[in-house]
Every structure is written in C-alpha cells, then in structure tokens.
C-alpha cells in the first residue's frame, strides 16, 4: 500500500447521547480503515480551547467549547490510504443541510450546531489533533487480517 495516513475523528456529545458511536465506527471499519486509538472521555475546557484554537476569534467559539464540554466524546484515530480526505467525504459537509444522503451528517443531522462528529480537515491538522488528544504510546500498531483484502 502507498503511504498510509492517520486522521482524528471525534464523536461529539450529541452523537454519543443519540447512540451513534457504533454506527460511526461501523462505517469507518466497513470502508476498510483501521482503528488505532480510541478514548471515551469528558473533554476539559482547556483541551477543547486548544483543539479549536483556530476558531478562538469567531463569535461562536465560547458556545462551541461549552457544547463540546456538555457531555462525553469519543476520540479516535483511524489509519488508511487517503483517510483524511475520504473521512471528510464520509462525514459530509459541516452544515448538515448541505450534506448528501449516505454521509454521516446527511443521514443523522439537521443543524450545524449539532453535527455529531468532527474530522481532521488536513494531514497537518490530523497530526496536531492526534498529538493533542493522544500520547504516542496510546496509538496501537498492528496489522489487520483484512489488510491484504483491502489494499493491493
């Protein structure tokens, strides 16, 4: 396989509360991506402010941090060929109204403020987000038995 990359995916509090964690994991697994890390946690305000630092000057920033801290989240790292780009396609548009049926947001969301999932928007962002949410030793290295059936 060509260079595999990693992406950071987080099921937001609304996705956890609505019982969509399993469905989201299922979609990434069925696509052929490999889960290398997973945490179920109540994110601290400090962690969330660091995660969304690029949005700190936007008017919705305080509300976003409050919403993301309102309940538990599921933080994950997925690996595979073009996983950042493909993962974003699987998520759908940030605004669910613009998301196509078949995408996670297109199938399960109505409003942008409750769009159930976050996914890294670039390889650089993924690296930053992964290092923010996970220690290096929390990323598990293994070869999936399905690997040879997914990649040439």
Swiss-Prot record:
Its cofactor is Mg(2+). CDD domains: NDPk_I (cd04413). The active site is at 118 (pros-phosphohistidine intermediate). It comes from the Eukaryota. One of its GO terms (cellular component) is cytoplasm. Its EC number is 2.7.4.6, 2.7.13.3. SMART domains: NDK (SM00562). Keywords: ATP-binding, Cell projection, Cytoplasm, DNA-binding, Kinase, Magnesium, Metal-binding, Nucleotide metabolism, Nucleotide-binding, Nucleus, Transcription, Transcription regulation, Transferase. It is found in: Cytoplasm; Cell projection, Lamellipodium; Cell projection, Ruffle; Nucleus. One of its GO terms (biological process) is positive regulation of DNA-templated transcription. ATP binds at residues 12, 60, 88, 94, 105, 115. Pfam families: NDK (PF00334). Residues 1-66 are annotated as: Interaction with AKAP13. One of its GO terms (molecular function) is DNA binding. PANTHER family: NUCLEOSIDE DIPHOSPHATE KINASE. Hexamer of two different chains: A and B (A6, A5B, A4B2, A3B3, A2B4, AB5, B6). Interacts with CAPN8. Interacts with AKAP13. Interacts with ITGB1BP1 (via C-terminal domain region). Interacts with BCL2L10. NCBIfam families: PRK00668.1. Belongs to the NDK family. This is Nucleoside diphosphate kinase B. It comes from Sus scrofa.
